[in-house]
Amino acid sequence: MVAYENVLANKASSGRLCKALGIRLVTNPLVVQLAKNAGFDALFIDLEHSTLSLADASAIACAGLLSGLTPFVRVPYQCGMGFVQQVLDGGAMGIIFPHVHTAADARAAVDTCKFPPHGRRSMWGQQPVLGLRVTPLHKIAEVCDRVASSVVVMIEAADSIEQADAIAAVEGVDVLLVGCIDLSTDMGIAGNFESKRFRAALEAVSAACHRHGKLMGLAGLYNNRKLQEWAVHSLRARFILCQQDSNLLALGAMECAGAVASIQLDRCPD
């Protein structure tokens, strides 16, 4: 019934890794084709740390659906149920909720994403994730709740680590995604991802996920191969935000300009 694959769910079912590209700067949906060419599996469309509009997010999400890259959208903190429903109705296959501190926060996230009786999401007919097909309402609810409304909660503070087990126990939560930059900053060790305290925090989240059958994800460890390998092999992380479009442009621009600047003008023209 669902028109498009939830790559994260399918890969996770067989223990494989889902690689996401963050989009927070580029508004042209053609960025999705670049992501596909590079081998990404999913999109992390960022409405928290960007000025992307709801229309931008929908256009990029629908391009992702058509290209086989599962679109997830990070919404602004405490943006409200109405906004989340617009994002889902616009084509997102999952919502990423930042700054989840308690089990109550996690339950509210689930409540926002799922149709009754599992939540309070309002019904709408032609869903992009169902190919805009006219679909019986009970089928929309069943299919969307099962495979097209993933709930990703972000663990980004020390108090969230303390509540990781309770958060992971919430029915309907699919992924505990550690926001490494905010977490390390909140712990007073900003960017010190090698810290024993930071690693212990990640281990606590991994253990909670394993106990309750949830997926662990990581964001913010960009281009950190050593820690990414540790997280995938030792912590069983299966969802990785690999990089942001803005960082790729910045790094590529510096490399390109630096290569030209390094050319020595030591010969006079003939």
Swiss-Prot record:
| Catalytic activity from the UniProt record | 4-hydroxy-4-methyl-2-oxoglutarate = 2 pyruvate
- Please state the pathway this protein functions in, per its UniProt record: Secondary metabolite biosynthesis
**Which keywords describe this protein according to UniProt?**
Cobalt, Iron, Lyase, Magnesium, Manganese, Metal-binding, Zinc
An example of a Gene Ontology cellular component annotation for this protein is: cytoplasm
Q: Which domain of life is it from?
A: Eukaryota
Q: Which residues bind substrate?
A: 182
Q: How is the cofactor bound?
A: Binds 1 divalent metal cation per subunit.
InterPro entries xref list: Aldolase/citrate-lyase_domain, HpcH-HpaI_aldolase, Pyrv/PenolPyrv_kinase-like_dom, Pyrv_kinase-like_dom_sf
Indicate the annotated site residue(s) for Increases basicity of active site His. Answer: 89
Instruction: Tell me the subunit arrangement.
Output: Homohexamer; trimer of dimers.
| PANTHER family in alphabetical order | 2-KETO-3-DEOXY-L-RHAMNONATE ALDOLASE, PHOSPHOENOLPYRUVATE CARBOXYLASE FAMILY PROTEIN
The Swiss-Prot or TrEMBL record describes its family as follows: Belongs to the HpcH/HpaI aldolase family.
Q: What is this protein called?
A: 4-hydroxy-4-methyl-2-oxoglutarate aldolase tasA
Which species expresses this protein natively? Hapsidospora irregularis
Name the gene that codes for it.
tasA
